[in-house]
Amino acid sequence: MKKINSFGIEFENSSTTPFFQVGEKNRIRFGMDVFEGNTKTLKKIIDFLFVRNEEIESSFIIGDISNLNNKIRYNKIGLSKFLKINNWKETSVVNDDLECTIVFASVKNINKNDVFSYCKSIVLGRSQSYIMFYNDTFLLYVSSDVLDIISKEEDNIDTLKINYSDIYDKRYA
């Protein structure tokens, strides 16, 4: 999760999405509804973000450990339908507010077509997970409501804002 931290993001802070953890010049937001019936645009955006497959990593919540019984309860998120998950690294973070420990997994070498398939499934109404895809340049946060993109380089976000000026969410721009 070191790579996530290089974006200025605290992934473990599940109370605040990554979008609100960075300045407005380093982020762009799309409502997922703009991709309904328009997944070609979604594909173009993902192709722009992730040029080479070998650089893509993902981190997501896989479960939690209750402070009461100290047993892990896994989320049934079905990511294996979209992502090839061989080697993952687990990180546990105590969350005092929820009175449990959140268990995160990080996976390397994600295929960009799998990123697209997952995002497309969310557009089509599939249940979401708290998940991010990232490389050295971009971080993509996906939920049922929004597709948030973060970059360390303001020029990258400017390019996206110019290319998709008619569809990105300008409320927080």
What are these regions (language model features)?
Residues 48, 52, 125, 167-170:
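Surface-exposed polar/charged interaction patches
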Residues 57, 69, 128, 144-146:
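Broad gene-expression machinery/nucleic-acid interaction feature
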Residues 121-133:
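Short linear interaction motifs
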Residues 1-121:
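Extended, low-hydrophobicity segments enriched in charged/polar residues
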Residues 130-173:
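Alpha-helical oligomerization segments
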